[in-house]
């Protein structure tokens, strides 16, 4: 179903409510990574160019008690956004009431306002997170049209996305549009061959994704901690490696269903301890010593995965290949990241989270077609689930 995008709306002289994802990491009141703010700029700038009034709002962290408010204000975000836009961003330190309403009424065309953390509404009965209908209706009453550009929360039905959209004409912002196009494209209509690379620690986190992608992808390459549950399902010794014992039968079923579509590592980098200081070495996947644990894929697996990627037209990657925060066990993730980045004739997509962080740390971000801004949202999209934040946007 085609959704309206911001370019479909008449924005001149309009009060434009914009749900952005400014859930940025902070330390001592300072923003440590402003990627999410930068990602929202095209939508905000377009609204201002069209002489709309931009009324922005976002959540920041979890807020359950008054004490939780400490360090969760969006004030530093307003200051950073103002620097990035090169113009004043009016900050309103509340989520409802006369102060906010007056500030919106006084807003002129081409001006920007950011109001306080939407999750401050969660202190009294989780009104934001539980999509309180009165709150959604109230926020909707503050604007003429609604633009949802927060893909990172699209898998949640909150008052600030679904609640407003059910009361007001709405459209996707440019970032949301891009996410629907690329992440949705993997599920709906990928250029083939489609190769999925899935990593991370737990099978339980990725079951839905593996099941769905086995029906869509030409190959599914599996790395990371969840590998060992699959190896155990094949009757291999995995030593002290991470094992989800209650998921072995399920892994067995997935292996049977997948046939040669599912590709597992052929070697592992092992150590006796989960530490960067402990000695480590590489062994073949079927001979992990009883007193050691696998913490990364080895070079033979990097080579195998690189070979499987050749000729792919669409690649989607979600989850690291090993404990990449420890440098001794980061080579698998780096190797896979490089292999995908070097593909010249493919649409390459990273499904957010740790993989996105890895690509950025390695300086490969610009080598990928699309890096998703939503970890949980992109995973649920890849599972084939309908995302409430997307479904609630007006159809064209």
UniProtKB/Swiss-Prot annotation:
The keyword Kinase applies. Its EC number is 2.7.2.3. ATP binds at residues 206, 294, 325, 352-355. One of its GO terms (biological process) is glycolytic process. This is Phosphoglycerate kinase. It catalyses: (2R)-3-phosphoglycerate + ATP = (2R)-3-phospho-glyceroyl phosphate + ADP. PANTHER family: PHOSPHOGLYCERATE KINASE (PTHR11406), PHOSPHOGLYCERATE KINASE 1, CHLOROPLASTIC-RELATED (PTHR11406:SF23). Pathway: Carbohydrate degradation; glycolysis; pyruvate from D-glyceraldehyde 3-phosphate: step 2/5. Keywords: ATP-binding, Cytoplasm, Glycolysis, Kinase, Nucleotide-binding, Transferase. Monomer. One of its GO terms (cellular component) is cytosol. The gene is pgk. It comes from the Bacteria. The keyword Nucleotide-binding applies. InterPro entries: Phosphoglycerate_kinase, Phosphoglycerate_kinase_CS, Phosphoglycerate_kinase_N, Phosphoglycerate_kinase_sf. It comes from Listeria monocytogenes serotype 4a (strain HCC23). It is found in: Cytoplasm. One of its GO terms (molecular function) is ADP binding. It holds the Pfam family PGK. The lineage of its organism: Bacteria, Bacillati, Bacillota, Bacilli, Bacillales. Belongs to the phosphoglycerate kinase family. Substrate binds at residues 21-23, 36, 59-62, 119, 156.
């Amino acid at each position: 179903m085609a959704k309206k995008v911001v370019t479909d709306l008449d924005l001149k002289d309009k009060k434009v409510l914009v749900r952005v994802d400014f859930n940025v990491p902070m330390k001592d009141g300072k923003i440590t990574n402003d990627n999410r703010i930068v990602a929202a700029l095209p939508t905000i700038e377009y609204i201002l160019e069209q002489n709309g009034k931009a009324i922005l709002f976002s959540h920041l962290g979890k807020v359950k008690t008054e004490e939780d408010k400490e360090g969760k204000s969006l004030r530093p975000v307003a200051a950073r956004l103002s620097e990035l836009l090169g113009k004043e961003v009016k900050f309103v330190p509340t989520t409802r009431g006369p102060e906010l309403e007056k500030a919106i009424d006084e807003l002129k065309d081409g001006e920007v306002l950011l109001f306080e953390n939407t999750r401050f509404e969660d202190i009294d009965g989780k009104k934001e997170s539980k999509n309180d209908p009165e709150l959604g209706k109230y926020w909707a009453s503050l604007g003429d049209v609604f633009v949802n550009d927060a893909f990172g929360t699209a898998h949640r039905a909150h008052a600030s996305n679904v609640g407003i959209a059910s009361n007001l004409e709405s459209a996707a912002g440019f970032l949301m549009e891009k996410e629907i196009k690329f992440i949705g494209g993997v599920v709906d209509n990928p250029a083939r061959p489609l190769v999925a690379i899935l990593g991370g620690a737990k099978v339980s986190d990725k079951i839905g994704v593996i099941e769905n992608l086995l029906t869509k992808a030409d190959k599914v390459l599996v790395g990371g901690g969840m590998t060992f549950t699959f190896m155990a399902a094949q009757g291999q010794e995995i030593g002290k490696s991470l094992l989800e014992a209650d998921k072995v039968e399920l892994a067995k079923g997935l292996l049977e269903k997948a046939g040669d579509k599912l590709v597992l590592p052929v070697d592992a980098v092992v150590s006796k301890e989960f530490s960067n200081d402990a000695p480590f070495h590489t062994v073949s996947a079927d001979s992990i010593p009883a007193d050691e644990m696998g913490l990364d894929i080895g070079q033979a697996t990097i080579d195998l995965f690189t070979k499987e990627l050749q000729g792919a037209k669409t690649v989607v990657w979600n989850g690291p290949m090993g404990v990449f925060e420890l440098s001794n066990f980061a080579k698998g993730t780096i190797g896979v990241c490089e292999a995908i980045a070097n593909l010249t004739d493919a649409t390459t997509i990273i499904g957010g989270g740790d993989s996105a962080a890895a690509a950025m740390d390695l300086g490969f971000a610009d080598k990928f077609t699309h890096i998703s801004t939503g970890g949980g949202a992109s995973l649920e999209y890849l599972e084939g689930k309908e995302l409430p934040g997307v479904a609630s946007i007006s159809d064209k």
